[in-house]
Each structure stands twice: as C-alpha cells, then as structure tokens.
Amino acid sequence: MWRAEGKWLPKTSRKSVSQSVFCGTSTYCVLNTVPPIEDDHGNSNSSHVKIFLPKKLLECLPKCSSLPKERHRWNTNEEIAAYLITFEKHEEWLTTSPKTRPQNGSMILYNRKKVKYRKDGYCWKKRKDGKTTREDHMKLKVQGVECLYGCYVHSSIIPTFHRRCYWLLQNPDIVLVHYLNVPAIEDCGKPCGPILCSINTDKKEWAKWTKEELIGQLKPMFHGIKWTCSNGNSSSGFSVEQLVQQILDSHQTKPQPRTHNCLCTGSLGAGGSVHHKCNSAKHRIISPKVEPRTGGYGSHSEVQHNDVSEGKHEHSHSKGSSREKRNGKVAKPVLLHQSSTEVSSTNQVEVPDTTQSSPVSISSGLNSDPDMVDSPVVTGVSGMAVASVMGSLSQSATVFMSEVTNEAVYTMSPTAGPNHHLLSPDASQGLVLAVSSDGHKFAFPTTGSSESLSMLPTNVSEELVLSTTLDGGRKIPETTMNFDPDCFLNNPKQGQTYGGGGLKAEMVSSNIRHSPPGERSFSFTTVLTKEIKTEDTSFEQQMAKEAYSSSAAAVAASSLTLTAGSSLLPSGGGLSPSTTLEQMDFSAIDSNKDYTSSFSQTGHSPHIHQTPSPSFFLQDASKPLPVEQNTHSSLSDSGGTFVMPTVKTEASSQTSSCSGHVETRIESTSSLHLMQFQANFQAMTAEGEVTMETSQAAEGSEVLLKSGELQACSSEHYLQPETNGVIRSAGGVPILPGNVVQGLYPVAQPSLGNASNMELSLDHFDISFSNQFSDLINDFISVEGGSSTIYGHQLVSGDSTALSQSEDGARAPFTQAEMCLPCCSPQQGSLQLSSSEGGASTMAYMHVAEVVSAASAQGTLGMLQQSGRVFMVTDYSPEWSYPEGGVKVLITGPWQEASNNYSCLFDQISVPASLIQPGVLRCYCPAHDTGLVTLQVAFNNQIISNSVVFEYKARALPTLPSSQHDWLSLDDNQFRMSILERLEQMERRMAEMTGSQQHKQASGGGSSGGGSGSGNGGSQAQCASGTGALGSCFESRVVVVCEKMMSRACWAKSKHLIHSKTFRGMTLLHLAAAQGYATLIQTLIKWRTKHADSIDLELEVDPLNVDHFSCTPLMWACALGHLEAAVVLYKWDRRAISIPDSLGRLPLGIARSRGHVKLAECLEHLQRDEQAQLGQNPRIHCPASEEPSTESWMAQWHSEAISSPEIPKGVTVIASTNPELRRPRSEPSNYYSSESHKDYPAPKKHKLNPEYFQTRQEKLLPTALSLEEPNIRKQSPSSKQSVPETLSPSEGVRDFSRELSPPTPETAAFQASGSQPVGKWNSKDLYIGVSTVQVTGNPKGTSVGKEAAPSQVRPREPMSVLMMANREVVNTELGSYRDSAENEECGQPMDDIQVNMMTLAEHIIEATPDRIKQENFVPMESSGLERTDPATISSTMSWLASYLADADCLPSAAQIRSAYNEPLTPSSNTSLSPVGSPVSEIAFEKPNLPSAADWSEFLSASTSEKVENEFAQLTLSDHEQRELYEAARLVQTAFRKYKGRPLREQQEVAAAVIQRCYRKYKQYALYKKMTQAAILIQSKFRSYYEQKKFQQSRRAAVLIQKYYRSYKKCGKRRQARRTAVIVQQKLRSSLLTKKQDQAARKIMRFLRRCRHSPLVDHRLYKRSERIEKGQGT
C-alpha cells in the first residue's frame, strides 16, 4: 500500500499517511501525483510519486493559481495547505537557490533536497547552548485533519521577525517558507511603535553587530512596513538607518532601562518628528499580530503571482479592472490595514489560522502623506471625528482610516450590483465608512465621482473603514474579505463557524443608489450589526424593547456634514459588548427590527466651505448637493437594527437643517436626522443664527463656549489647548470638544414624529466619579435653566429654517433641561428631550447613572472623546512602577475601538496603548522620576479619560509600607483617588443592581419621568447647585456624590459581595478617616443607616473594619491627628478605641506618640464621661423596677431608629431566610440608627454585649432627648408603648424580624424592640427583643430573627430571658469593671494591649454577685420559672453541645478570633428552638475536637443525678450551663454578625466562660479517655498475648516442618546414592564385556593381516577363516 510506482515514500510520510488513513474519512486516502522527486544525487526518478492525502483535504481546499511572492500577514492553515497540495504548479513555483535575507513578507517554495533554505543570512534566535537555533515545531490541522508541519524561528535582533516553514506531512520535501515581521501592534498600539518597541532585546545581541551589519539585517525585515505613526499629525517617515542609529545610541547611553523613544511623534497636536516617548517597554511579541504594512503596494496588496482563490468566486464587481488589480498589476492603495486582508483575493474566504493568531487589523499608515494633514483623520479635530467614527465599533473592530491618494479604495461592496458601490472616490473625498460584518472588513468603495459617505455598517460593524480617497479614478473595489479570528473569537457572529464567516452581504441593503457624480450624497446604510452578543442583558432587554428598534437610520442627506459626530452614528451600532460595564451592549437589538427610518434628505448646504480643515465635511460642498430622492437607502429590509442614536422617526417630514441654513427637505416621512451634534448644530447661542459661513473661527469659539456656559468648566478640561478651545471644523462650525455630553446622548430627533421615545437608559454609571474631582464636577453639572446650559451639543431643533438655536424654546426644541443630560448625575432621572415639534418625541433620557453606557451605546468612545466627554478609568493595575518604567499597565474603562489609536499619558508623556480586549487597554509606562503622576487615556491624541494617579516609586522603598510603622502615613492624592475608586466601585455595583429595574421602568414611560427618574430629579438639581457651591472642596464634592448615591434605593438587593480592589485593605471609611473628612464620615454613617441592608455599604462603612495592618478608621484618624473625624468615629462606635493594630498599638497611644496629644485627651475625656454616666446608675436595670428605664431606653432606641412603629405587618421576615446576608452582616440599621450622627448606636457586634447595653442605655437616655436629626420621628415613649400594647407577642416577634429584614431599610432593628416590649411584655420580653434584634438569627433563645414566629415567645423565651436577665447583672458588674479597666488601658495603652482577656472575663464572672448564681434567680421573670427545669435546660443542651463542638476551639482570645473566621451555624436554622432537633448538623466538623455528641454527653452528665463521684466534680452546674449558654450565644451572635472581627468584650466574657467550661470538659474528656485507654490497653494486651502465643506455636510448627523437610531431603539423597552405585556396577560389567569383545576383534584383525605373510601357513589361515565363518569343522 505504501509503495507508489516503485518508489518508497520517505519514512515520515509513510507514518503520517498511516495517520491520515485513520483520520476519520471513510475513504481514507486519495492518490495525487507529485512531480518526480529527485534523490540526493540529482537522479530524478522519472515516475511520479503518489501521495496519499485525506479526501477531506482535497475536497475542501481549492487549488491555487499563484503563489504570492509576498504576504504581509500569516497565512491560514487552509491557505498553506492549498499552496502545498497544488502539486502541478510546484515546479513553476519552486525556487532553486537559497535567497539571502529575503524581505519581510516573502513567501518562497523550496525543495529541501535541493536547497539549503535555512542558510538565509539572518541571525535567528539560538537556544541557551548558543549552538542550535531555537525552533518551535507544530503540527497544524486543516478541517480537523493533521496534515501540515510547521517550524518557526524568530530573529535574535528583532524578535518580531519570524521565519515559518511549512510542509505537508505526506510530502515533506516541498517546503513553503514565509518571512514576516509582525510588530506588536497590539502591544504598542501604533504600527510604528512596535517596530521600535519590539527591539528591546539584550544589548549583548546588538553589541555584536556593526551598524552596517545591522542595517543589512534590518532593512529586509522592515520592508513594506510604514514607519510613521501618523498619530494624526505627523507623517514623517523613519528609515532603518535612523532606527539602527537610535538603537545603537540608546544601547550605548543606557537611558532608563526598558524604555525607548518611539517615533510615534504623536503627542497631542505636536507635529513633525518630535519624538515623544513611546516607552512601551515590553513590546515583545508573543503571538504575532498584524503587520502594519503600507509599503509600495497597498497595505495588503500582495504582489503576487496570482491569487489563491482567484478564479473561484469572482464577484462581478461593476467594473472589470478589478481583475488586473487583483493580479497585482496595479499598486494598491493602502487601505484597510488588516491583519488578514489581502486586497487581492476576491471573495476568497480566508479562514483564520488557528495556529497563528491572525492579528487584529491595524490601520497602518494613517495619513501617510504629509500634506494630507487636514484630512479627516488628522489633527485634533479630525482625530476627534475619526474617533467618533470609531467609537462605536465593536470590540474587535478596527477603524481603518487610510488616506488613499489617487487610488480607489479597494474594498468590496458587498452586493455586487452597481447600486452598491457607494459613490466613488472622486476628487472629492468620499468617505467610505463601512462597517463590515462578520469579521470581514470591507470598505465599500465609492465609485462614481460623487462624494459620498457611505456608511455601511453591515452585519456587524466590525471595522470602520474610513478612507478618504482623494482621487477619482473609478477603480473597482475588491473584496477584502478577511476573517479575523480575533474578531471572531471576541464576537462570534451568527452562523459563523470558526472556519471563516461567510459574508452576509445580503444584509447590506442594495438600495443605496449610486447618486450621480455631481452630488455628494452621504448614504448611511446602517445595517445593524446583527446580534452583538452582549453581556449586559438588562440593557439588551431594554433596547429590544423598541427604544432603539428603529434605530437604523440611513441618512442620505446630501448635506449631512458629517462632522465627527455625525459620522458616528451609524457606526454606533457596532458597539460590541465589552466586558466593562460601561459598554452598552446592544445585543438584543433585534436584528430585523425596523429600519423604518429609511429616508433621504435633500438639500444643499451652501455653507460648507471647502476648507482644508479636517472634517468629514465635504470639502467642496460649495455647490448645493441635491440628493436624489431615491438615495433612500431603505434600510427597512436590512437585517440588523442599527443602534444609532437615530430614533424611530415615525412620521415627520420636517426638515432638519443639518448645516447652517441648509434646509434639507426630508422627503420621506421617516426622516432621521442624524443630527449628531456639532457640525450639525450651529453653535447655539444667543446669537441665534450663526450660520456656518459667517461664524469665523473666533466667533465660533466664543459662541460655543457661550452655548454652554456651564460647559465652560468642562471645556476647560477637555479642550486641547489648540484652537482656543474651539476646534473649527470645516465650514466654521466650531466643534467644542468640551461638549461633554455630546457623544453621550443620542441626537434627539427634533422633528421626530411623536412616538419616538428614545430611551437610552444608560446602564452603568461608571462615569460618575471622575477621579479627578474636577472632572467629577463637570460630570455633575446639571441644568440650571437657560439655554446657555445646554451642553455644547445642544441637540438642535429640527427647525426647518436653520439650526439657529434661538433662545425661544420653540425654536430650540430641546430646552436645556432636556438637553443637557448632565452626564453623570445619578439622579438625572429621565430627562426628556421633548422636541418642540413632535411633542411626544421625548427621549426618556437616561438614568444618568447609566449615561455612560449610553455613551457607549452611542458607540462612542470616539464621539465622546470628540465631544470632549471624559470616560472613567474604572480600574488600572498596577498603580505604580519603579522609575525606569516599562511595567505593563492594564487600564479598564469603556474602551471599544480595536484600533491602535489609543495612547496613555503618564504625566503628559504619551505611550501607545492597545486594546487587548474590549474595555481593557494595555500600555507600558514610560520612565519617569519618582512621585505621583496623572495617568490618562487618549484616543487619537485627544484625552478621553479622567485622570487617575499613577505612582513612580523609588527602588529603595517597599511597595507599600511593609512595616506597620510606615503604614499610617498619608498620601493625600492617593487617598483621594482611592476614595473615588471605592465610590466608583460601589456606584458600579449599584448600577448593576438597579439596572434591570430601572430599565423596566424607563422603557415603560417614554414620558419625562420614565418612572424611575422622577424621584431622582429633584436631587439632581439640588446636587447641581450644591456642586457649584461646594466645588472647591474635595470632601464636599465627595459628600455630594455620596448623598446622591444614597438617595438611590438600590442597595438592598445585593446578594453577593463584590469587592474589587481595595487600597491597602482600606475601606471608604478608612480613607475618609485618614483624610480627616468628618463630614464625609457623617454622610457615610447616614448612608449606612439609611441602607442598613446593604452588604456593600457594610463592607465600606464599618467603624470596626480593619485594613491590612489591622488599623480601624479611628486608628487612622488618631494617627494622622484628625480630631473631628476621630470624635465622630468614636461616638459612632466607641469600641474602636480599644482595637489595636497589628503591632498592638492602640489609637490613643498612636495619637500621643505622633504628637496629637489634644486628640488623645479629647477622646479620653469622652471615655471618662461615658464611664461616669455608667458609674452613676450601674444597676438600674437589675432590680425589678428596671422596667421604666428600659422602656425609655427602648423608646430611645426606637426614636433613634427613626422607624415608625407602623411598619406593615405583612412584611415577613426576610431575615429569616438569609440572616447571614441580612441583619447579621448588615445590621447597621441600629448603628447609626438615627440619621443623627450624634448618638451613634452601636454598630455591629455590639449588640449583645451587656455592658454595652448599659452604657448604651445610660448614654442614650440623655442623647435621646437631644437627638438632633429632624428625621427622627419624635415618638415619646408613651406613644411607643401604645403601639406595643396592642401587639400580641407573636406580632411583636414578627415585627422584630421584619425589622431585621431588609425591606425597610430605614427602620432600625431596634424599632421593633422598642415598639413591643415596652407595653405588655415585661422585661423578659424586652430582653428578648433586644437580644433578638441584635442577635438576629441567633440560635436558640433569640431566634426571632430566624423564626420570626410566636414560637419564639414560647419555652425558649424563658431561656433567653433568663439568659438576658442573668447576664444583665453580670454585666452591670462587668460594665464597671470594664470601664475601670479601660481607663487604665487608656493610661497605659501599650502595656495592657496584650491584656489577657481570659483573666478579665474570669474576674468579671467572679465579681458576679452570689444571688445571681442561685439556681432560681429570676430577675423580673414573670412567667418563666420553668426555665430551671431540666427539660428546658436539656433542650438547650443539644444546641449548646453542638455549638461548643465548634466553640471548644476557642480556649483563648486568639483562638476565638480565629474561630470567627467561619460561620458556626448556617443562616436559616430552624432547629434553634428548644424544641427543635439538636443542631449538631450545623456544627462544622473539626477533626480533633470533641463532637457535639461528646458535649451533650458532658452536659447531660451535669444534669443527670446518677453521675459518679469522679464525674460529679467535672460537670457544670445549671448556672454555669446557663452562663455558658449565654456566652456561647453571645459568641455566636457576634460571630455571625461580624464574621472575622470578634469584639473585645465578647471575647472577654464569652471566651472566659467557654474557657472555663472547656477546661472542665477537657478534664471530663480526659477522665473518659483514661478509662477508655485502660480498657483498650487491657484488651490490646490480651490480644497481644494471645497473638504472641499463637506466633510461638506457629514458630514451632515451622521448625518441625523444616526438620521434616530436611530429613526427607536426606533420605532422598541416600536413595539417589544407592541407585548411582547400581548403575555404576552395571556400567562396569557392560564395559568389561565390551573390552573383551574388542580384544577378540583385535586379535582377529591381526590374524587377518598376517594371513598373507610368508611366515604364516596359508592353510592355517584359511582354516581359521573357515572357522571364523563357521564353515570349518
């Protein structure tokens, strides 16, 4: 089978064939004849060799007509295989001699037997041994069949330069070799960057070469790569010589390590060859990404012999020249710089190469011509414009902007008919904006001389190709269809399998008519991107709801001056979902939803001058551009809805004047004016009609700025200094980058027919906190009325006359309020843009919280950027670097563009950045001196993000204070930044939670409120004014932000914690304390009180939370000397003062040691006052007379809690379902129960701490009267009583639980306790109430939170009550003891830090009066004596036992602390009732600790009378059990509420009790163990003894056996000897006879011989013979 016509295939091929035989195809092989293979001696075997190839391969691969000489991207596996199986062409293609240093892109076919193709003159990377080349080998699959072998090497000089050799496994002699330099475009973000940046190899490597040698090596490597960065301004090229020189210099001078000057020259606006630092230090290529090549041929033109799939699917493009071009006869313009575009191939499907990453495309030489500077892509404005176009592309989208001069854009217009070719590149610049689908990037070229902007976002707007062709030659577009696997992976389109998506050209509606050459028609065919898969469903749904359904508008308006903004629109559809929240995903926008908006506007815009200024303005639109009516691109049939800002314009025939006075009459009713602001809008100001023409630049600038005075501040931030703040776009419409909102909001269709409600409910509020608060403020700017406030992008009215945004509302349909959707204010309910014309066309404007997303929705990073809107950097990591830079920094935010136009500014040093996945930019920080610098993201050199702080740290310093001692140091900026980050994170989280609900509401109401917005509207305004007033102070601004966030009721929903990064483990409260922001702290307390159920808040705002070095917020305030903040924190929760940091230092100690003596004294004074109060009535609560005071106490709690007693009874206990998440963690409602910050109720764990109760009671009695917050409903105790009176106990309980449950965040937990107990429950109940509230879900006695049922009031009740009562007394004592202890503690903070809590607790317990220790001591216990009965006690036992099973690991405080790290009981345990089953199922097994069963045995031993004497000593008395129970309960509560943060008091008491019981238990257990051990030993000994005996007997048996065996062997031996003797004898006898015979024979022989002797008588002889024969006688 392997033999093919007499010649054996090479061994490898045999093997691989055998593999292919089994490759799964039924007929496994097909024979192909291969040209004769010559053996090494050159003898050609004339017969053809047959090669076995899997049938599958032959079926799926086309034969190739030509092998391209160069290709500037990696081939896909299919292409490689196709070249290698086209055997019949190999002779023609084979190169017979090795080439020296083939150029970048070269593809060469060699026969390895004839050519030593590896000796190519390049220096390839060697292995560590320095001898052999480092090769990577891999087998590649085609159609699932392994058939190719690849061998890859890369240059040791330029690591991005690779040589890849491929051969068929079945025919290894023919090798396809491909040389390619793939600069890390994705790494450095600009095609030029990578070239240099990638050259960061060792100096050693470079040192070996002379300059000439280097140039010789490098020149071919960089063949075809364009050197300019064309960041928009510079087109200066660079030569290899300069590169080499620069590198050599840099290596000699040793600049900061790992940074290299990049030739990007793109710092904002800087022209020419100013080199800014590109320091992308790490530009090594990992997987080669695209090559930026715009060489002599167009970037993709492959000069090739002929194209791969040439003959196969030729699209009949309307003209015939395409073939020639395709064949490489025409140098192609550089158009799409794409990873895989080959201009040449027609519709060939290039399948992505799985093994080689086929890179994302790059727009390689943007504006390579120096004189093109004013083309749209250049300069700031144009940059903006482009950006805007780009903003909307999907993640993998790249925007190709290439200025093609004198060549048509080669791309394909998808449906072959002439009506597609979007108008031609005439002398006028036709912008071809085509967003193509499915990863195939096509630009739809314009053919015909009219200028046209054709925006065809086809199926998925993957790449926006903006190419302005400056020459009118009508070249036929060629399809550049490439499947870009990266795009595909990120955004797999519908129906596309990995093999390469079929072009869905049919999507593009073919109605775009080619309008006659004279006209400039811009047709936007926006066929929306099919379903872009998104992550944010909430938005999706909302979108799907029709808000955008209409959105694909085709604007055919001739005069649509597409300034940056407008161009965006269509592309907006492409937004691909990005991972960051910011991105809107339109995925569910149903594709075919209605493109009702097909329409065309005709009109002329006389005013557009042909100014060179960059813009998408038609440069010579001076003649009116009538558009034919039929340019309607009727999108209605095209399949995806395009999510453009264009709203459904149902019927309106008003004209929108897009430019100055152009009156475009909109013929079709559904006119969508994509009035994307800017150019479309005249500068709106009092000046009314500043037509484009008239307004000179200066004027324009003034105008615009006027137009948003409010904007003034924003514009300051964003305007590039360039033109006086106003960038003039062509025709004098000033484009104000400061229009902060521009990009954000959809253009309101002024003339929309009524129904167009556009609800852009933006989803995520990321933007809201700009880390630089200045930005923040801008974001919060809100409308104060007066058209001046409209953001610069006032949505212009659709007034048919002109855009003059006249002051009168009628003209300017959007009143400012509607327009200025202030960017971020969360409150921004729904602004509606009601256009004056279509009254109802209100755009229920987004909840701004979500504006950002809208922005994304709009697609528009670019837009935003263009409009000066700033994006939020949501996160970046790492936040620092050493001074030499070179660290990879990832920055997350709403970045969408897959183009390489991003850069990051580190303190104004620009470095290229690349989008490694939607929402994540990567850059490498430049070298910089130590210190903090701002880090911002720029797109096309326009800054588009807020600034965040990046730190350069000196090498000497550790990253973070590694020792506790440097810890409490402050870096203001860093802390401020962190505050903002924390808020941002919370806000994002909030947005996630609210998103869905708000969408529902929003989409429901197109009217102003949109449902959810109404509530927030008010605060919006207030916030705005507030912001203005407070603007100066960072703290006040943050307070405003917090208040706004606070006013949104979205916190209760969170079910899971999300906490991204913390700064040194510090929460918001820590940061505020460190900065000394007392007002902020109070605000946070209020916030926490208000949203008591929010886990997020609880994490961020908790006075007892500690950072990485165990510092509480109070510790920070004390350490940094912030008196006011420290007092606020201390009052809120005084326990924090006794929490030491990891070095054991207490806050007061640190304050003193750092010289903040006043602060320390103040806090000590507060402490003393409290203790004094405690001292006055320590025992108030013990006697039966306690009731009144408790009532008042409760009442006071109640009032603190602000809760109104009449909480609906219907609310059931949610706490019960999930206490773990609810109250226990987020119990804050009591903490700051009132919104007053004056009496800070106990936060968190405090609850059960009895002593705390006391202090609380005493402390609160006075405070209750002075509660200052207005919102405390002053309910007098009496009113309180009345309510409770009516409650039946069960109701009361339910009330508690209700309190505990989140639904009414404001009601504090205590409300319930306040409201019931007072009246008819006696203190027993009261206690129950209190404890329950505190313990919420606490097992057993107070399981109200859990069981929320009357059962709580049953037998269990006495227990708990008793517990409380008992406890109380203990506590009184404890309180005073502790207070004194604390005073001492304050005095000598450092010494008693390590106070042994156990001893303390034991002292306390010893101090407990004896009467309390009496069994039946029942203070104020009316009904519950049954408590003492063993039954009840034992009922608690099972619980206690299981608890102790866990708790017994808490012998010492430290252990207790550790135990706190995991919950002891699951949250909704119903078995806690005494009657319930034992809770042992809850206990977590701790392997070596006694089990619950052991404990229960121990405890029951205590209650049973039949305990043996020895045991009697070891058991607990009932009282001890009671105490133990309380302690355990306390621990559990505290623990439950504060996983991980045991409180000091709880530790003291509980640990002591438990410790004591534990010791007894240990003795008991020890005794038991001894007994068991004795028994065990005895039994073991017995069995051991028996075993020993048995073994001995066994040994004897063995011996006997052995002896017997040896005896047997002996016998056998003897026998053998005997037989041997016999045999011997026999042998001997037989030998004897033999000898005798022999002797006789010898004699006879002798006689015979002698017979003839004359001496012998013959007769004698004969006779003897006869005798012998027996004849003789």
UniProtKB/Swiss-Prot annotation:
InterPro entries: Ankyrin_rpt (IPR002110), Ankyrin_rpt-contain_sf (IPR036770), CG-1_dom (IPR005559), Ig-like_fold (IPR013783), Ig_E-set (IPR014756), IPT_dom (IPR002909), IQ_motif_EF-hand-BS (IPR000048), P-loop_NTPase (IPR027417). Belongs to the CAMTA family. Transcriptional activator. Residues 283-375, 990-1021, 1215-1246, 1264-1317 are annotated as: Disordered. It is found in: Nucleus; Cytoplasm. GO terms for biological process: neuromuscular process controlling balance; positive regulation of calcineurin-NFAT signaling cascade; positive regulation of transcription by RNA polymerase II; regulation of transcription by RNA polymerase II. Gene3D superfamilies: 1.20.5.190, Ankyrin repeat-containing domain, Immunoglobulins. One of its GO terms (molecular function) is sequence-specific DNA binding. Residues 1547-1576, 1577-1599, 1600-1622 form the IQ domain. SMART domains: CG-1. Residues 337-367, 1273-1289 have a biased composition (Polar residues). May interact with calmodulin. This is Calmodulin-binding transcription activator 1. Induction: Detected at low levels at interphase and in resting cells. Up-regulated during S phase and mitosis. Levels decrease at the end of mitosis. Its main location: nucleus. It comes from the Eukaryota. The keyword Kinase does not apply. It comes from Homo sapiens. It is linked to Cerebellar dysfunction with variable cognitive and behavioral abnormalities: An autosomal dominant neurodevelopmental disorder characterized by mildly delayed psychomotor development, early onset of cerebellar ataxia, and intellectual disability later in childhood and adult life. Other features may include neonatal hypotonia, dysarthria, and dysmetria. Brain imaging in some patients shows cerebellar atrophy. Dysmorphic facial features are variable. The gene is CAMTA1. GO terms for cellular component: cytoplasm; nucleus. A motif (Nuclear localization signal) lies at residues 112-119. Residues 1003-1018 have a biased composition (Gly residues). Residues 302-313 have a biased composition (Basic and acidic residues).
